From Swiss-Prot:
One of its GO terms (cellular component) is plasma membrane. GO terms for molecular function: G protein-coupled receptor activity; peptide binding. Pfam families: 7tm_1. One of its GO terms (biological process) is cellular response to hormone stimulus. Widely expressed in peripheral nervous tissue, gonadal tissue and brain. In the brain, expression is high in the palliovisceral lobe and superior buccal lobe but low in the subvertical lobe, superior and inferior frontal lobe, posterior brachial lobe and pedal lobe. Expressed in stomach, rectum, aorta, heart, salivary gland, branchia, pancreas, radula retractor muscle, branchial vessel but not in white body, esophagus, liver and kidney. This is Gonadotropin-releasing hormone receptor. It is a multi-pass membrane protein. Receptor for gonadotropin releasing hormone (GnRH) that mediates the action of GnRH to stimulate the secretion of the gonadotropic hormones luteinizing hormone (LH) and follicle-stimulating hormone (FSH). This receptor mediates its action by association with G-proteins that activate a phosphatidylinositol-calcium second messenger system. Ligand interaction triggers steroidogenesis in spermatozoa and follicles. Appears to be involved in contraction of the radula retractor muscle.
């Protein structure tokens, strides 16, 4: 909604028979400032979200669930950029609505549709991370679950945006300069405006906020609980084998790192949504229910809210650059990847073998009288466990290393 044009148009009530016609709203310094801010937000949002979409489409193979969600979020943010920000720029430049009644209804519908979609995709990101952390064993169900959430986000956005097309219409008033057209709401009573404002507040902010905050509180609780269990669980020296180290700790550790990394990114996206939109909805509440009459304040905070579509691609880009930089730093420290072998005996003694995969050289630290069972590679938790080359895993009955291979 263009609150500046709308309020100026609405507040100029007059008696035609007793007072002269007022001046029509005109382009002034307020509009200049608004155009500069909105223009900057639009350019950054357009190029940022376009690059995110291109980057995700260039990914080979199947996309992960978080990548599918980020793709849809970028599409939703592009819709906000065009149907909210760009339309507001054009409308501010012309001051008057010049596109007719049909376009008034269509554009108002698309304006709210983009906001709903961006909000519900952000909620889906929070839910996806919540399922990933709370129920890691259901990874196979994640793609279907995400497709359902994305579909629901699009369908609900389309349904909840319908009232906007019904409420808004082109209206005309006579000013001294002539007939003035504006696209604005057509409530017949104050309670209608308050009812629609309350429903918009609940559907676009309150319910999504509750879901997102609850999801990340559950994530935080689970991570803290898991960390305590990991540090507090003692390792049994009589039953631990290389196989249990590999598939019980190493593999879980790698998956946990991947989940936590994507959870951090999605947490920042959710935090940006809350920080950008909370001030606007507080002002919106006073504007709708307490008859605050400061349209310019609403404009400032609505611009802050729509700038969320500019921040999301910057957040995704920052995490992508950090991931690449971290990967290159790791490669610089170990160009070919260091292969760490862990060999554990039933007495709890261990030996480690560090092998450089490029040169094939390696070094082993052995303990005299040690019983070697199996070894595993930390660099590939999916690799089958097998004895280390050059070290016989057969033990003598007394548990000591044989001096030569048997038979």
């Amino acid at each position: 909604m263009d609150y500046l044009n709308d309020s100026m148009f609405n507040n100029m009530t007059y008696n035609i028979t007793s007072t002269p016609l007022p001046d029509a709203p005109r382009f002034d310094n307020v509009y200049v400032s608004k155009l500069c801010v909105l223009g900057t937000v639009f350019v950054i949002s357009f190029f940022g979200n376009t690059l995110v979409i291109i980057q995700i489409f260039r990914i080979r193979g199947s996309r992960s669930t978080i990548q599918s969600l980020i793709l849809n979020l970028a599409i939703a943010d592009l819709m906000v950029s065009f149907f909210n920000i760009l339309m507001d720029i054009i409308w501010s430049a012309t001051v008057e609505w010049l596109a007719g009644n049909t376009m008034c209804k269509i554009m108002k519908y698309l304006t709210v549709f983009g906001l709903h979609l961006s909000t519900y995709i952000t909620v889906s990101i929070a839910l996806d991370r919540c399922f990933a952390i709370l129920s890691p064993m259901s990874r196979s169900k994640a793609p279907l679950r995400v497709r359902i959430m994305i579909t629901m986000a699009w369908v609900l956005s389309a349904i909840f945006s319908i009232p906007q097309a019904v409420i808004f219409q082109e209206q005309r008033k006579m000013f001294r300069q002539g007939m003035f057209h504006q696209c604005r709401d057509s409530y017949n009573a104050l309670w209608q405006k308050q009812l629609y404002s309350a429903s918009s507040l609940i559907l676009l902010f309150v319910i999504p906020l509750i879901i997102m905050v609850t999801s990340y509180l559950l994530i935080l609780k689970t991570i803290v609980k898991t960390s305590r269990q990991f540090h507090d669980t003692p390792i049994s020296p009589t039953s631990m084998s290389c196989y249990s180290v590999n598939h019980g700790q190493i593999r879980t550790h790698l998956f946990e790192r991947a989940r936590k990394r994507s959870s951090r990114m999605s947490a920042v996206i959710v935090a940006a949504f809350i920080l950008c939109w909370t001030p606007y909805y507080i002002i919106f509440l006073g504007f709708a229910f307490f008859q605050w009459d400061n349209s310019r304040t609403v404009i400032y905070f609505f611009t802050l809210g729509t700038s969320n579509c500019m921040l999301n691609p910057l957040i995704y880009g920052a995490f992508t650059i950090y991931k690449v930089h971290r990967g290159r730093s790791g490669s610089a420290n170990s160009p070919s990847g260091t292969r760490l072998m862990i060999m554990v005996n039933k007495r709890g003694r261990s030996t480690t073998t560090t092998t450089n995969r490029m040169s094939g050289s390696g070094r082993r630290q052995l303990t005299t009288g040690q019983t070697i069972t199996q070894c595993a590679s930390l660099t590939n938790p999916h690799q089958p466990v097998r004895p280390s080359p050059g070290i016989n895993s057969t033990t003598s009955p007394n548990g000591k290393m044989p001096t030569k291979p048997p038979g």
